[in-house]
């Protein structure tokens, strides 16, 4: 089986590297991926966040403030900026959220669902501080809570992607630019 990342999600991953460089980081964190998602034009995520009571512009400003450091990353070192272990773990969680939603394609929304579920990064804290729950996001996305497969492990339906294979494929795409977005899973 293959897990596929949508073109929008791959574009957000490319933006996440730019966000890491812009904010002075030498690696890409889950918050940089969220900032990359918030840079997408006309993304469904904006509608979902708005319905859940979170203005995307406010979230972007708060994340910028939280992750910005006064260290500059030279633009010529951009290609050496890689995913952190935390970002890789969040990508794995986004894959699981896609499966829980019944999708073989990982969309930016699935990352936002993962951010709501998994604590650690500032994006999770921001959603939590604004009273956003997993259920409110699922329903804001137009899904029925009863249809969301929270009660079953996502791996029941298909195997979880190998995190190292997935991370290697994403790193390669970040270096080469996104194309098909197909990630092999074991």
Regions found by a protein language model. Give the residues of each.
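Histone-fold recognition with a strong bias for associated Lys/Arg-rich disordered tails
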Residues: 1-186
């Amino acid at each position: 089986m293959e897990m596929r990342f949508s073109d929008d999600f791959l574009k957000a991953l490319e933006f996440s590297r730019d966000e890491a460089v812009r904010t002075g980081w030498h690696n890409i964190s889950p918050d940089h991926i969220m900032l990359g998602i918030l840079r997408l034009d006309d993304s469904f995520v904006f509608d979902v966040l708005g319905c859940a009571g979170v203005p995307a512009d406010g979230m972007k400003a708060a994340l910028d403030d939280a992750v910005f450091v006064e260290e500059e990353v030279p633009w010529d070192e951009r290609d050496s900026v890689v995913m952190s272990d935390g970002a890789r773990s969040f990508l794995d969680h986004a894959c699981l959220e896609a499966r829980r939603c019944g999708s073989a394609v990982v969309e930016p929304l699935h990352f936002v669902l993962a951010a709501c579920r998994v604590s650690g990064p500032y994006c999770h804290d921001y959603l939590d501080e604004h009273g956003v729950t997993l259920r409110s996001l699922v329903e804001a996305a137009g899904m029925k809570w009863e249809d969301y497969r929270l009660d079953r492990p996502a791996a029941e339906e298909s195997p979880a992607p190998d995190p190292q294979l997935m991370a290697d494929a994403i790193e390669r795409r970040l270096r080469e630019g996104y194309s098909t977005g197909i990630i092999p899973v074991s």
